[in-house]
Amino acid sequence: MDLTFKYRIIIIESLNTDNGDSLTGTHLFQNILQRLPSKFPYIETSFYAVHSLGELHKATDKIKSIVDNGDIVILHIEAHGGEEGVTLYDDSIISWIELYNLIRPINI
């Protein structure tokens, strides 16, 4: 299959083992996603471990540039969420509307 673009499966993980979290995003990436490109060369996989809102912004900026280059992205976020929003590694919270606005450009 000769494609001019790539499919990208990207995991953003913001979990903290000090709080008893299992690094499920890490396990998913290492045990499943990293194997995909050998079978499907048109698929690339990436993993971002983010510890703060600033790191989340940096990761989504990189992902936005991937989308701007024409690749198709599937984004998977491993973090805890609640009524207020998503809790990051450092216990900061990004509200649902803030998260929506942050990742919306990736989906347009």
Listing of model-derived features with the role each one plays in the protein:
Residues 1-80, 86-97, 108:
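A domain-level signal for caspase-like cysteine endopeptidase catalytic cores
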Residues 103:
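Structured alpha-helical
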